[in-house]
């Protein structure tokens, strides 16, 4: 029996096509994935992300524990509400999950992890927390709605109270703040401005309806995937997993090497990999007809005339750009051109940084 979010009936009211997503009944689309995608790029769309796992880490050792658990360093967080993206690694430097951590106080942090990895993550966090003065509490009674797009903040403001709007006024990107019963964060998975709103389950349906009434378009997993890929954001299980280290997943910027005595889990293995050199995650652009897809092989010849092979991790048609884009893991000697094998022939592609669209505009 699949899990259902508190908004399941609201999806049915909007004629959603429901699919199983890692054990959750979730909307794939509400009729047109392209229209939903474009709404987020041009106006405002919203996603039910209540399947995500919210975990509060509280206690005298909360900071010390998270500094060991995560490859990024929560000690960098000094301003209440500031958020940090990073990886949780195993001893071999494989990525157990990527997650966002919000700093509330020195003894209170909120972590949001992926739904597909929930049980694995919670077990790992519980195991690693032994010996630390921390309490790790999952918050299943909280739903989450992501409102994204150039008009998302204005439309969200119309459904928030005066006090809630005052609480989040002027909030910078990548922050979260408690505003009455809501936890409102300037984060997202689309490359657009907006909010991710953590809301008590008993208020979630009314909030969803209020946003609908403001003209915010409901969007499903299909549009969520094309939007995040245009924004060059990783999807766990495709672009990285426990067999992949963060240096090979365009997550090098999320590793806090300093201070050098911070012994986070996976550090020694990661230092060895760093010194030896790893593959890297790049962007591919194909302006010919056709669509780049997961698992297609990528070929290139280096400056010494040696052929190398990589693989596409995520690929799609980009509605914003009008042609296909992909992320691919390849040897780091790649230049600015390559070939992808599709339909038994090789097609030329451009190699770019894995970031295709930001704020509705081409980013490469």
Curated annotation (Swiss-Prot):
SUPFAM superfamilies: Aminomethyltransferase beta-barrel domain, Folate-binding domain. One of its GO terms (biological process) is glycine decarboxylation via glycine cleavage system. GO terms for molecular function: aminomethyltransferase activity; transaminase activity. It holds the Pfam family GCV_T. Belongs to the GcvT family. The glycine cleavage system is composed of four proteins: P, T, L and H. PANTHER family: AMINOMETHYLTRANSFERASE (PTHR43757), AMINOMETHYLTRANSFERASE, MITOCHONDRIAL (PTHR43757:SF2). This is Aminomethyltransferase. It comes from Shewanella baltica (strain OS195). The lineage of its organism: Bacteria, Pseudomonadati, Pseudomonadota, Gammaproteobacteria, Alteromonadales.
């Amino acid at each position: 029996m699949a899990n259902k979010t508190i908004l399941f009936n609201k999806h049915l009211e909007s004629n959603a096509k429901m699919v199983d997503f890692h054990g959750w009944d979730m909307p794939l689309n509400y009729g047109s994935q392209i229209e939903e995608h474009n709404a987020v790029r041009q106006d405002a769309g919203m996603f039910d992300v209540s399947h995500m796992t919210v975990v509060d880490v509280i206690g005298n050792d909360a900071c010390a524990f998270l500094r060991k658990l995560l490859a990024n360093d929560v000690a960098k967080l000094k301003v209440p509400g500031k958020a940090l993206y990073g990886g949780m690694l195993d001893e071999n430097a494989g990525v157990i999950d990527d997650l966002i951590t919000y700093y509330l106080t020195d003894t209170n942090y909120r972590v949001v992890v992926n739904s597909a990895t929930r049980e694995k993550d919670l077990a790992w966090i519980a195991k690693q927390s032994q010996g630390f003065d921390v309490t790790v509490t999952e918050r299943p009674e909280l739903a989450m709605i992501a409102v994204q797009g150039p008009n998302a903040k204005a439309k969200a403001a119309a459904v928030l109270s005066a006090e809630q709007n005052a609480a989040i006024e002027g909030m910078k990107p990548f922050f979260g703040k408690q505003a009455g019963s809501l936890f409102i964060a300037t984060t997202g998975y689309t490359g657009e401005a907006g909010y991710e709103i953590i809301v008590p389950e008993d208020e979630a349906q009314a909030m969803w309806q209020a946003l609908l009434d403001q003209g915010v378009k409901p969007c499903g997993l299909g549009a969520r995937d094309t939007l995040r890929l245009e924004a060059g954001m990783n999807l766990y299980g495709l672009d990285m997993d426990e067999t992949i280290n963060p240096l090979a997943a365009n997550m090098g910027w999320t590793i806090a090497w300093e201070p050098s005595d911070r012994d986070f889990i996976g550090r020694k293995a990661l230092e060895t990999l760093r010194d030896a050199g790893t593959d890297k995650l790049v962007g591919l652009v194909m302006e010919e007809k056709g669509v780049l897809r997961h698992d297609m092989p990528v070929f290139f010849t280096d400056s010494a005339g040696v052929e190398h092979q990589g693989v596409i991790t995520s690929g799609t048609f980009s509605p914003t750009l009008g042609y296909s884009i992909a992320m691919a893991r390849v040897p780091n000697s790649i230049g600015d051109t390559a070939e992808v094998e599709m339909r038994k022939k090789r097609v030329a592609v451009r190699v770019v940084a894995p970031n295709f669209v930001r704020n509705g505009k081409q980013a490469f």
